[in-house]
Every structure is written in structure tokens, then in C-alpha cells.
Amino acid sequence: MASNEGVENRPFPYLTVDADLLSNLRQSAAEGLFHSFDLLVGKDAREAGIKFEVLLGVYTNAIQYVRFLETALAVSCVNTEFKDLSRMTDGKIQFRISVPTIAHGDGRRPSKQRTFIVVKNCHKHHISTEMELSMLDLEILHSIPETPVEYAEYVGAVKTVASALQFGVDALERGLINTVLSVKLRHAPPMFILQTLADPTFTERGFSKTVKSDLIAMFKRHLLEHSFFLDRAENMGSGFSQYVRSRLSEMVAAVSGESVLKGVSTYTTAKGGEPVGGVFIVTDNVLRQLLTFLGEEADNQIMGPSSYASFVVRGENLVTAVSYGRVMRTFEHFMARIVDSPEKAGSTKSDLPAVAAGVEDQPRVPISAAVIKLGNHAVAVESLQKMYNDTQSPYPLNRRMQYSYYFPVGLFMPNPKYTTSAAIKMLDNPTQQLPVEAWIVNKNNLLLAFNLQNALKVLCHPRLHTPAHTLNSLNAAPAPRDRRETYSLQHRRPNHMNVLVIVDEFYDNKYAAPVTDIALKCGLPTEDFLHPSNYDLLRLELHPLYDIYIGRDAGERARHRAVHRLMVGNLPTPLAPAAFQEARGQQFETATSLAHVVDQAVIETVQDTAYDTAYPAFFYVVEAMIHGFEEKFVMNVPLVSLCINTYWERSGRLAFVNSFSMIKFICRHLGNNAISKEAYSMYRKIYGELIALEQALMRLAGSDVVGDESVGQYVCALLDPNLLPPVAYTDIFTHLLTVSDRAPQIIIGNEVYADTLAAPQFIERVGNMDEMAAQFVALYGYRVNGDHDHDFRLHLGPYVDEGHADVLEKIFYYVFLPTCTNAHMCGLGVDFQHVAQTLAYNGPAFSHHFTRDEDILDNLENGTLRDLLEISDLRPTVGMIRDLSASFMTCPTFTRAVRVSVDNDVTQQLAPNPADKRTEQTVLVNGLVAFAFSERTRAVTQCLFHAIPFHMFYGDPRVAATMHQDVATFVMRNPQQRAVEAFNRPEQLFAEYREWHRSPMGKYAAECLPSLVSISGMTAMHIKMSPMAYIAQAKLKIHPGVAMTVVRTDEILSENILFSSRASTSMFIGTPNVSRREARVDAVTFEVHHEMASIDTGLSYSSTMTPARVAAITTDMGIHTQDFFSVFPAEAFGNQQVNDYIKAKVGAQRNGTLLRDPRTYLAGMTNVNGAPGLCHGQQATCEIIVTPVTADVAYFQKSNSPRGRAACVVSCENYNQEVAEGLIYDHSRPDAAYEYRSTVNPWASQLGSLGDIMYNSSYRQTAVPGLYSPCRAFFNKEELLRNNRGLYNMVNEYSQRLGGHPATSNTEVQFVVIAGTDVFLEQPCSFLQEAFPALSASSRALIDEFMSVKQTHAPIHYGHYIIEEVAPVRRILKFGNKVVF
């Protein structure tokens, strides 16, 4: 070596510090390395590469893995060098365990000693690393440096080779640490499982299904209360240190302290020599928090071995037995220790050589490690995260977890007559408030409102509006239910036009009184409807938009069919009660700025009139003679005025209030003081109310046009021209055929009028008196001699288009009148011939001896007319009766009943059966709707009028019974028929499953309190259940009639804690093996393989893991909703203009002018361009489950299944797929979680229900929802059953290991993590089939109060509610300076 001066003058400054490089390398690597360098001779690089393998083998044999021994992770291991490890093929070690017994003094027979053989499997692990050495460096090493430059190159080559070797050694060191950590994780079940199963309070009872149910409950409790405990401690205030200590102590206590190496303690504290009881492996952040919370012990060092003990196999069989805590090496050792010297106590010094030779001579060195004191245990704490960070590898203790959250939108709380808040002040009348939105808080504490607008991309999609999948599911069932409906499924066409005969034949000697399912549902409260005993009705309540029934196909096979419910009012009463409908009505008032014209006095007057048993029957005669003709009304103004004034003065009630045309004509012609001002004011208010309601409906619908049609007909049935008034005097039928494009059919008897060209065949136009004067004789002859039963012509006046008069008439008959009268009315047929004879065939009417001004009663003989006038308390003049008689000249002969059938609108036409796509109604032609008759009235009028119960609003059995004796007999024979919804009506006139108005609306009308709210409620009940209606209601914040359960899955980045007890794993370190992988001209690549083995030495689970803190929430916890138009692009409504309108309104993804990729119709997912940027993280997708508004709000205040019925069946006695399916889907059994009901949401929990077909991939025709569906795990049948089976097996496997069943040589049970545990830890909601409640409130005021400084808040405020977040992740909510944890 040259002098220092020479070195300084050379351009190789690094040589100044490497003067003793060779000696250092000899000491640090191996003496044989450089000795072997001298053996390499020759210039062939390949030959040199081959020979260098020998060198490398010598070098790697010197690897000591000292770094692992210097980690706290080694505390939990007994580390032994086992040079013969490569010869081991099937490693098993047996341990003998004697079970202690208790000696009893009560005479019981002593227990025999029981000894079991525990078999521990040895698992091999292979780690390897790669080293690449340059041929140029090797050649330089073989040369002899002579010049300073050569010497510098020589030193550089040595450095390069040594660096490559050191790189490989470091990789192997890290590989050993990673292997040990992986082994620990393989034996570390989650804390919430281990803590429950290790509790003898549960396990000593065995593992029956009752105990398993308790175990699952404890799983959930520990998961909720103890996950992420460091986050909870941060905001706990005082006592946080004790809380953290208790959680860590529970981890220490949960694992088994028993080990087959009992007494072995290779690591102790530096001061005091106290054994280290185990180690917590944590992340850097958790380590800092723990030391901050608990403080570090003064003794922050532990003493550990600096080398490995040697494991030597001696004898043919190596048997290590543990008996009474003593370690034996062989059976001879067993005999010497237990038999020969039973009193001699074992010690660590004497026991340890039984396992590892030379352990007592191991040198010990201090190791820097954090130590915390938990009770009487000293426990080391270490983070290995830096090693993984340096190598850019994921740290095993950092995990991604997915938690599902759910919250309700639009629940209705019946009778909300109280509040738990004294701070909130809302509207003047808060008792009728109806929630339409849910306020939630995203992860960045931004307050967001989830309302109907957010859900339109789901609610307006065709998949929600089709029953096809539901029907396929039902028809695929083994057999339909026993009870099949036969009544009111289809309209039956009569072969004649005599309505009186139809009614007589139907009720004459009728004994059977079937009740439809729709009517049966109306009579049940929500609790009874959802009860398991009501399964027969509940099983067909699968879809909120359809009534499902059992019909027959052409082959007389029973098939399920579905008809659209059309309107919100047709929802079953248990799922949409009357109070809810009235609350919707109030929302409708507010949203449309409806100012009622009528007041309560008018409503009460109308109601008094309807229930007036002395209502003058003569008024019906007057109304029949006028029958909607304005000309005839003008002719009879004096008589009409007399009727109104007399009735008003006598009783304070309104005449003719049952007829829209009469009210319209009264308002138009009697405003000149012809009648009482008070009475006229009431008529005007009634008519004004109709106009106000019509204008409110127009504001609701808006002015949009879809194609050539107003959007109003898609929004509200009252605005749909295809719905006709219940009575007709003018030719509204031909007008319907002209304006409707929905294939209307006018069924007249057994004839069908469907083309305006056939109008002369079916319509007999009746003009005014002057026009018809020449036909009076012909009309008379027809009335006397015509075959009226088989004459299918309708005598109607010409249709007069008066703007929105048709809508006003429908509002009157379908809203105002049934609401104010409680539907206490019935259709009334008129025998015009007999009425004419009663009026005209008397002396004063046609004799010239009487003047017009004479009182007719003074000159009238006894007869029907006199009786009518007397019971009506009316004294008309002779002229009035003559004018009324003259009105008969153009009257028809009888009242006719016509059936009108039309297609549903295109959004409600998705039923598979063509007949189910149509809706029907009966219209009385030249008929009336009347109030109840008194006994005296019926005796007088029985030959003039007859009852026609033809409509849900105009078929009250109590009223019909007063008009028709057969009806009265039928009702008396069947008392249940007194209910409006249950009353049987002739099938030629009524078929409930085909009607616009069905039992729920009839029940509401019959039972509502006549009021302004009821009028608004009935109006809102006519809003359709269609996409356009949902769009309109979303715009005005009106409740759509159904609630929603919103499900969202959020992803959490968690930092976990692993605890492992001391000596719980025995690690065997073998010898390395070097092989050449690749030899090139420029370099040689070597692989170093190292074998290791591990044995779990614990007598139970000796390690556990639990989430300690939330590192980050990766999703935004927001309100982004699944776009079904992108998920299911192939499904559409039958009209392209309608599709385009809906997509434009809901903001569905569109591809511009580009044609859709045909592959998307198969794959089901279009290329949706995401947002250009994100502010709150990855958008969490929300999905909608349609839910009844009567769902129990308490259900959403704890973790439950979003389906509405528990789906975790782990408590089965023996897992069987058929049993599991029964517990999940069989609603004849009670819900396992709520035994008093089958479900909280029949529209989602049953097979084939709407929720099931939306999110169960069994029904997919194109694809399942999106790239990710948070609902799929709760609905997909295969996945649901797989998770159930996995959880069942997991609980059984853990129970077998922890339930006191010792292992034997036959079972060889190992204490490892059961398959599926990681999924359970990371996705617990999928296994438990429950979602966690998210913080939400139906009003922002409740959120504000929740964030106030008060300790308590208001969970209920009249109709509003707040749901607290109950989830493993406890979020810190901060608005301004207000913080809530």
C-alpha cells in the first residue's frame, strides 16, 4: 500500500477510508470467501461463473439472521437452528396433554385421568432472493493489481460484489421477518370473534343453535363497540388511558397463554428480568398513539438471545410431551420426570434443553423495544412498517375494509302527536308533516340532502315498472296458493242492455260473498298485514306498482298475472294509510299553492245533504228529466229554483249537489237572485273549488309536451282524457275515440264500439227540442214498441267542448263528491217511461182547465206524483210540472251501462299479458248518482228508479240496500259486505282488478273525515305511479307514495394491531442453498433459497388482530346514485319520445349523437365518463330499495338487513340449503330478528319481489347493476347463501377449536384462521347480512339540534325523525365550531 501522501495526490478519494477493507470483509462475510477467490484461475468467464457458486454457498452458510432476533416480533417465537430441515418431508410433533379434574365430596364417582395427544403440524416456508454479479468484476477480482489504477479497480470490484451479496442477505433477513409475520397472521383470528368464542360464559353451554345465535349477537356487539378503539379514545376526554388499557388487556386475555413450551422465556425486560409476555405488532401511527396514551416504561429495552439454539433430532421417534406444565423430550424423559421423580419441579433451565440443545448457553444482548405494562404483564410494542415502506411493499397490518350503510327516505310515522325537542320550531301545523328527504353528512362534514331527485335514475327506469321477472319467479314456484280468486278478475259482457235485470239476477238468491285480495288487504292494520299468519296475502304483495292475482291461461293452468295500480291511491291501505294520504294532500296544497275555495261549512253542508234520509226524491225526477241538457235546465229554471229554495229554507241543505251538470248550470243561470244568496254562494264555492283543484293539478304537471300529448295525462289520472266521468249525458265516447291513441273500446252489451266510422250504429244523437220536434212521434213509437234490451244504441246529446270542463267533472265525481259524502252514494238507474207517466198522466199536467200558476197539489189526485211531492215537501205550480213533462220529449227510455276499456299509458304498459295492459271503467249513460232512500221514498219510487252499484265510489252497499230489496237481503245475509271495499258488485258492471279506482280509494273515501285536507288527499291519490309523475313530484317536493331505503358501501383504510403471546410459535431455520439461475457473457445470476419451518406451539389461539384506527375513508360517503339507464341500457318503454323525455329529465347518461356500442346491450354497462375531478374522494354508489312508508323507523336505528328481513341463518342446527332458503325467503315463518312479523318490506325481502329482481343477478337478462352494486351482497341468492354457509362453517370450526373439545391424533385440529375470516373482517356486512345505520335526519333542523351543545338531541319531532350512526367507524362530525363524536 502506498503512503498517505501518495494517496492524497491520487484521483480516487474513496481509497483513503478503505485501507483495511479486506480484513473488514473477512470478518463480516466469511474467511472462506477470499480464500476461495484464490482458487479461481483461468480466463473463461463461464467457467469462473460456475466455480463461483461454491464461493456463494460458503458465504451464505454464514448468514445468521441476526436482525430478526433483534426485533420484538421474535418475542413470540422460539427460534431454533435446524440444519436437517431439508430432510423433513412431513413434519408433525405430538404433545401429550392431561386434562385436570376436580375431586368432589358429594359421593360422585371420581373422574378418571384423561390424556390426549395433540398433534402439531410443521409448515415449511421457502424464501429466496436473487443476486447478479458482473463478469467484469469477477475477472478483476482474479487479477493481481499492480498499478494504482488497477488497485482502484480491484477495490471497486470487491465493493460491488460485497454490495450484491449484502443486498441478498438483507432480502433474506426481511424475508424471514415477513414470513414470521405472515405465520402470525395465519394464526390470528379477529378480536371480535376470538373474544366471544373464548368466553367460557358462552362456550360452557355447548354450541346449540341458541348459543350460536348469542355468539352472532356478541360478534356484532364487539365489532361495533371495540373496533377502531384508538379513534374512540381520542375524543373520550378523561379516562381514555384506562379505556385503551382495557382494550389492550382484553386482547392479551383473549389469546391463550398456554403453550407446549410452558416455562420458556427467551426474552425478558432489561431491568428486573421480568418475562415479556408477548408483543403487539402495530403501525407507525398506532405506535405513536399508544405511547402517547399509555406512556413508555422506563425499561425500554429487552434482553434477547444473540444466536439460535440448535435443534437436533435423536432417536427414531421424537415425542415432546407436556404434562402438568412440564416439558419432556422423550418417553424415557417422561418416565424419569413423572414416574421416578414426580415431586421434582421443573424449571426453565431444566425444561428448555428438552426442546433446543444449547439454549442455556446462548449469549444475550439488549434489544431496543418499547415496553408497556398491562396489569402484571410486560408487553413489547413494535412497528415493522418501515421495513415494508423501504421495500415499497404493502404492510400486512394495513387493510381495506368495506362497511355497508343504509338510511330511509320518506318514512311516515303514524299519529305523530309528540316531540322530544323543545328547541325546534317548524311550521304552524307540524303534525301533518311528511318527510321527503334525508339529510346526511359526508366524510368531509358536508351536509347533503338525499331526496326524490337523487333517486329518479332508478325510479324512472323501466326495470322498476315491469312485473315480468316477478311473474316468472312466481310461475316457476312449485305450486300456487290454495285460495284462488274467481270474483272481480274480469269484466263479463252481458248479452242485453237491461241493467235492472243484471242487478236483479246478480243479487237474487246470492249466498256466496267472495272478497278480493285487494279488499282483504284494506281491512288489515300494518302489523297484522306483515304478520306470518297473513302469509297468504303477503306472498303476492311483491311489487308496489302492481296488483298480482292468479288467473288461468288458455290451457286452464293457474298462472300469476299482474295489473298496474295506476295511482298512488290504489296502494294497499296497510302500506299507505289514510293519514299518509292526507299528509301527501297537504304537501300537494303547499307545493301547488292551492288555495281552497270551499270552507268547512260547505263541506259539512254537502255531508249533511248526503246523509239526509229525507232528501226529496222528486229532485231525482227533476235531474232525470234534465239529464245534463242545458236547454232543459233553462226550461225548468223556476222549478229548479223552487226546489233549491224550499230545501235550503227547510233544512239548510243543498239540492242537486250530487250532479256536476246541475251545479254547473245553477252557477251559470241562477245568479240573478233566483235562489237564496247563501245557497248560491255555496254552489259557486263548490264550482270554484273544482277550478282551483284543476289549476293546482296543471301546475303540478307543468306545460311540457311529450310527442303531441300533454305530459299531464302521464302525471295524474284526473288529467288523463282516457278516464271518463262516471255518468254521461253527451257523446263523450266518440270524442274519446277521436282524441285517444290508446285503443279505446266502448263495450255496449256484447258489442264493441271502437271506430268513429261506426258512430251511427252505436250513437243516437239527441239535439235540442227545436231540432228534435220532427222526430217526437218516432221517438214515442220507439219508446213504446222498441226492443230496448237488445238495442245497443246510446241516446246522447252532442259533445260540447268547454275547455277543461271534463277535468272539472272528473274532479267533482272522483274527488269532491266521494270525499264530502264519504262515498255514501250509489248509482241510480232511471225508467224514463215510468217517470214520464208519473209526471204527465194526471189532470193538471195536460188539462187546459188549470192555469200555469195554480198549485198542483191543490188539484192533484192521489197517485205517485202526489206522493212524491208530499214526501219531498214541495209545492210546484202546474206550469212547472208541464215544463218538466215537456222535457221528456227527447229523453231516453232507460239508463244504460257502458264499459270503457283503454290501454294504459306507455309507462304503465309493461305487464306481459295483453289483457293486463288495459284498464276499464263503467259509465252510466243517462243515469244518476244518488243518496240513500228512506223507506217511504223507496215505496214511492221503486217503479221509477233502481240501484246500480257500478263504481267503488258509487256502490255503497248501505245505500244500495235502501234502493233494492235483493241487495238489502244479500247484505243482511253477509254482514261483511257492508264494507264499501268488500261489497260484491255485478261483474257486468265492475271488475276490481280492471278498475281505475280500487278498494283502497273506496275505503279512504268511506272513512275519511270530510275536510279540506281530505279533498287535497284524494286529489293527490289520483297522481299516477309513473316516471313522469315521479319527475313532477320531485320538482315540487311531493312524496311519491313510497319510501326508499338507500344502501351505500364505503371503503375504510384501517390500521390493525396484532398481538401474539410469547413462545407461541417455534421457528426452525434451515440451511441455505445456492443455485445458478442464468449465466450470460456479461453477468451471472444466482438464486439463494432458504428453507424455514414453523410450528404453532399454543394450546389454543395465541394471536389475535383488531382494527385500531381509521387511516382514511376512501369513499365520499355521499349521495351519488346508481344510474340504471347506464346499467340496463337495453330496457326501455314502448315509445321513443317518452324514453327521450324521461332521460332528459332525470339527467341519465347520454352518448350524444353517437350510436350505442352494440356490445353494451350484452354487457349491460356503457362507457360512462366519470366526473372530471373529485373533491371528496371516490364516489360511493347509493342504490335504492323501494320501501313501504309504514316501515318501522326503529328498524333503521340499528344494524339490519336492507332487504327488510334477517338473512343470517348461522343459528341453524345443521346447515342445509333448503332450511337456509326457508329462513331467508319463507315468509310463513316469522323474521328471525323480529318474530312478530315476517318482514318490514315485502317489496324487497320475498323471492321475486321488486328489490329481488332489481339486485339479484338470477333475474338478469343483460347484466347486474354496474361495476359495483352495494345491494348485490344482500340480494344475490347464490352469494347470500354462500356467505351464510361460510359464516356457519366458520363459527363451527372456531367453536370446535375453542369449545373445550381437545384435539386427538385423529382430528389433528390446528389453531389457524379459518377460511373466510379475512373476508369476514374486511366485509362483515356481507357475512352478517346487515348494514349499519348512517347518520340521517328527515329534517335539517334535527341535524342542527344534534350538532348543538346539548348532551341530548331529538330523535323524534312529530313526523320527523333522526337516525344516529351505529357503525364500527365513529366519525367526528364538525360544523363550524360544533363537534359531535
UniProtKB/Swiss-Prot annotation:
Protein's gene: MCP
UniProt entry keywords in alphabetical sequence: Capsid protein, Host nucleus, T=16 icosahedral capsid protein, Virion
Listed SUPFAM superfamilies: Major capsid protein VP5 (SSF103417)
Full protein name: Major capsid protein
GO CC annotation terms, alphabetical: host cell nucleus; T=16 icosahedral viral capsid
Cellular localisation: Virion; Host nucleus
Self-association and partners: Homomultimer. Makes the hexons and eleven out of twelve pentons. Interacts with triplex proteins 1/TRX1 and 2/TRX2; adjacent capsomers are linked together in groups of three by triplexes, heterotrimeric complexes composed of one molecule of TRX1 and two molecules of TRX2. Interacts with scaffold protein; this interaction allows efficient MCP transport to the host nucleus. Interacts with capsid vertex component 2/CVC2. Interacts with the small capsomere-interacting protein/SCP.
InterPro entries registered for this protein in UniProt: Herpes_MCP, Herpes_MCP_upper_sf
GO MF annotation, one: structural molecule activity
Family: Belongs to the herpesviridae major capsid protein family.
Recorded coiled-coil stretches: none
Function statement: Self-assembles to form an icosahedral capsid with a T=16 symmetry, about 200 nm in diameter, and consisting of 150 hexons and 12 pentons (total of 162 capsomers). Hexons form the edges and faces of the capsid and are each composed of six MCP molecules. In contrast, one penton is found at each of the 12 vertices. Eleven of the pentons are MCP pentamers, while the last vertex is occupied by the portal complex.
Pfam families for the chain: Herpes_MCP (PF03122)
